[in-house]
Each structure stands twice: as C-alpha cells, then as structure tokens.
Design a protein with these regions (language model features):
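Hydrophobic cores of alpha-helical transmembrane segments in multi-pass integral membrane proteins
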Residues: 2, 8-99, 107-126, 143-159, ...
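Cytosolic, membrane-interface loops and tails of multi-pass inner-membrane proteins
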Residues: 126-138
Length: 230
C-alpha cells in the first residue's frame, strides 16, 4: 500500500484497474472459445477507451504497452488462442501499471471487482442472442466480481473504514453490489431465456453500484471531498 493514500482514490487508478479487468476477461473468454470475435472486439475497445487517460500520462509505459497489445489482439481476434494470450498480456500490463501507481492490494481488488462485474454484463449480451451457450463462464465472472467486492470491503476495513457516519454509504453500495451479483448467479440457474435476461439486467445495476463502492470506499480512506470516516 502506498504511503500516499490519496493515490488509491485517484480516478486514474480506478480506470487502470477497470481496463485491466476487461482485458483479462477478453483473454479468458477468447481462450475458452465460447463466443465469436465480436466479444473480443467490443471488450478490447472498451478496455482501450477506459485505459486511454493513462496512456497519455507521463511515464506510464506499461499502459502504452497494454494499448498496443489490445490493438494486436483485436486484429488477431479470429485466431482465438493467439488473441487470448495477447489480451492476457494487455491485462497484465495494465495491472502492473496500476500496482506501480497505488500498490498491489488496491489494484488487484479493484481489478477483480470491476472486471468480473463488467465482464459478466458484456458477455451476457451474447447469451441473449444464443441462450443455448453454456452459462458456466457467466457464473464464474459473477463469482469473480463477488470475490473482488468482498476483497475490496476487506481492504477498506484494514485501512480503517468503519460502519458508521460517512462510511455507511460505502457499505450500502458494496452490500447492494454483492446482493445484485448473487442474484445474477441465482438467475443463471433458471434454464429459460428469461434467466439470462434477468441476469444481464441485474448486472447493469451491479456495475453502477460497484463503481460507486470502489470509489467511495477509497475516497473515505483518502479523505477526499465530502467523504469522511466520521
């Protein structure tokens, strides 16, 4: 954890972690060969867009390497094995940049939470087109998101976030996010098409609350703006 706690609430870190999570999801899904290259193109594009601010920051060469890898992975998306490996390299490069910026724990928890929730939401749209696809990947991404949110909560407790005062907003957001993603897992057990529809809709809400939980928890620790531990 960095000595300057304000770095863990810096928007650049959150964007780097988000980009890392998306790129890693693109790599894993590409290697699993469950959907076509369209998912890789979309996820790589969103990852590149989210990570773009870091690319133009001074000295962030890992982020630039990640962007290059995303472009190459998108170009090779029809070769799923090769593209999957390149996307994993991109995600790792973004994660390294985030770790250098704010420390390993802060970067990894945000990457897991944002990557799992966003990846489940995006991949869910392919299941809406073809609900016969195996749902294991969706369930696994949802579980990764839940694990990341739980780790994020543990990190904030370790950094001194309590359960009263201004910290209440964080706990409402993180508990709501975990509840929504748990509901996603439950909806995916329902074999009908409506189960995938419900899971995808719930993941949209979970993404909003997850973003809020990640930022508010860190802002509490850093003492930024109106956020206060008391």
């Amino acid at each position: 954890m960095p000595a300057d706690l304000q770095s863990i609430a810096d928007p650049r870190l959150i964007l780097l972690a988000w980009a890392a999570g998306l790129a890693l999801v693109a790599g894993v899904v590409s290697l699993s060969r469950i959907v076509g290259p369209g998912f890789s193109w979309l996820t790589a594009g969103v990852s590149a867009l989210v990570g773009l601010p870091a690319v133009f920051a001074e000295g962030e060469w890992w982020a630039r390497a990640a962007l290059l890898a995303l472009v190459l992975g998108a170009l090779w998306a029809r070769n799923k094995a090769l593209a999957g490996v390149v996307f994993l390299v991109a995600g790792t490069a973004y994660l390294v940049e985030a770790i250098l910026f704010s420390g390993a724990l802060s970067a990894v928890t945000a990457t897991l939470a944002l990557g799992g929730v966003t990846g489940e939401m995006v991949l869910g749209h392919w299941y809406l087109v073809d609900p016969r696809l195996p749902r294991l990947a969706l369930r696994n991404l949802a579980l990764v998101g839940i694990g990341g949110l739980a780790a994020e909560a543990g990190l904030q407790v370790a950094l001194g976030v309590g359960v009263t005062g201004g910290a209440l907003a964080f706990w409402v957001l993180v508990v709501t996010s975990i509840a929504l993603m748990t509901a996603v897992v439950g909806a995916l057990r329902y074999p009908a098409y409506s189960g995938v529809m419900a899971a995808t809709g719930l993941s949209y809400l979970a993404l909003l609350t997850t973003l809020g939980a990640v930022f508010v928890g860190r802002a509490l620790v850093a003492g930024l703006g109106p956020f206060d531990l008391t």
